[in-house]
A protein has these predicted regions:
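Helix-breaking motifs and short loop linkers at transmembrane-helix boundaries and internal kinks
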Residues: 44, 76, 97-99, 244, ...
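Cytoplasmic helix-loop-helix junction between adjacent transmembrane helices
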Residues: 107-142
């Protein structure tokens, strides 16, 4: 049966809206690393309190991500996007107005709830309805946000304004996005193509959690996000406070890191359907270890920055590609919950490992940051190999059919 003519146009509109949602997710992450030295001075907290702030935000993020499977069963994805983006906007404006450290932590919980619902919901939706190409471009849009974030803070500080104005700007933009998602929320209903296989009944949460491949996937995402976030959030402090890099140059270096993530995802999206995915991801993870070594050992300042960019470029396709393979590894009945668990584990890894590196740097000096990134990158490579061994390669040739925007439709492996 031929799909209605409106179906491709609707799918394209939904992809565009998903791209906008991921830009909005990336903006706050890009702000924090550069704004933090100024923020901690205003609130009178030590440098490693960044880990406390990240952990607090992750409490909300984990709650929303872990419960995303249940949330999507009772609330349409369009409504989830509208409400969660509104919550994130309110949190960012709260950051700008926070009079004291406890208030900032409260707004961090709200920011986590909003971001976690958008992240897990769109990843679960995208794994079913978007191709690996679109998923990589989706995560590239996160990179657009994280690349713009440091530039916004650097420009605001360079203009002699306080860091709070950068949060006002981004929070106001997110209010506009929340309105857009509210007005278009009904477009997400019934978006599957006419020829797509019906989704299996979702498995019980405890049945999904009984699968070893789900736990190994969660651990892989935990460490992956640890590498990405530690490199992003601590590199500015290392360069400015330990290595004597001027603030403007260090801010540019962080933007280049996020930019390499964005560019890598855009590039990989154009070739994702033509390369052997497992071998390509393995090569990317090996390259990330090389980049981490350059950043840590700093043969020259330029090579250290190049290493930071190499980490970003090499990690670029990993998250989205692993998400796209999840339905094939765990089965359609387990996919939504498994992806929610993976996103939750990713959020926990970003917060917990950022906090751990902060404590270690306070004890052993800021150069511990480069060593930590290197060790985590090597651990990620080892975990990936274990994930492939236990879970297989996901959907192989001949196992899949095509859905909206080239989405992979996988056979169900059972709900038990």
């Amino acid at each position: 049966m031929t799909a209605p003519p409106a179906a491709p146009a609707r799918a394209s509109v939904l992809a565009l809206l998903a791209f906008l949602a991921f830009v909005s997710l990336g903006l706050p992450d890009g702000l924090l690393g550069v704004a933090w030295p100024s923020m901690r001075g205003d609130f009178g907290v030590p440098l490693d309190a960044l880990g406390v702030l990240a952990a607090t935000q992750t409490a909300g993020y984990l709650t929303a991500s872990f419960l995303s499977g249940r949330l999507l069963r009772v609330m349409p994805i369009g409504t989830v996007l509208a409400l969660s983006t509104l919550a994130a906007a309110a949190a960012l404006l709260g950051f700008a107005a926070a009079p004291a450290w406890p208030a900032l932590l409260g707004f961090a919980v709200l920011a986590g709830l909003g971001g976690g619902a958008v992240d897990a919901g769109l990843n679960a939706y995208g794994a079913r309805h978007f191709s690996a190409r679109i998923l990589n471009w989706l995560h590239a849009c996160f990179g657009v946000g994280t690349t713009l974030g440091p530039l916004i803070v650097t420009a605001v500080l360079g203009a002699g304004q306080g860091w709070r104005w950068s949060y006002v700007l981004v929070g106001t933009a997110q209010l506009g996005l929340a309105l857009t998602f509210f007005l278009t929320r009904r477009r997400w209903a019934g978006s599957a193509s006419a020829g797509a296989a019906p989704a299996p009944d979702p498995a019980r949460t405890r049945d999904t959690l009984r699968r070893p491949v789900v736990w190994l996937g969660m651990l892989t995402f935990f460490v992956y996000t640890g590498v990405e976030v530690v490199a992003a959030q601590w590199s500015y402090s290392l360069m400015t406070l330990e290595r004597g890099v001027p603030p403007a140059q260090a801010g540019l270096a962080v933007s280049l890191y996020w930019g390499s993530l964005m560019a890598g995802r855009i590039l990989f999206g154009t070739v994702a359907h033509r390369v052997p995915l497992v071998a390509t991801l393995r090569a990317c993870l090996v390259t990330s270890v090389v980049g981490a070594l350059l950043f840590w050992l700093e043969p020259t300042p330029s090579l250290a920055v190049a290493g930071l960019m190499l980490i970003g470029g090499a990690l670029a396709p990993v998250f989205a590609s692993l998400v796209s393979l999840t339905p094939g590894r765990v089965g359609g009945a387990h996919a939504d919950s498994a992806i929610g668990f993976q996103v939750a584990a990713a959020g926990l890894g970003g917060a917990a490992l950022t906090a751990l590196v902060g404590v270690l740097s306070r004890w052993g000096g800021l150069e511990v940051i480069g060593l930590s990134v290197t060790v985590l990158a090597a651990l990620l490579l080892a975990l990936y190999e274990g994930f492939v061994r236990v879970g297989g390669e996901g959907v192989g040739p001949g196992q899949a059919t095509t859905g909206p925007l080239g989405a992979t439709q996988v056979p169900d492996r059972g709900a038990g």
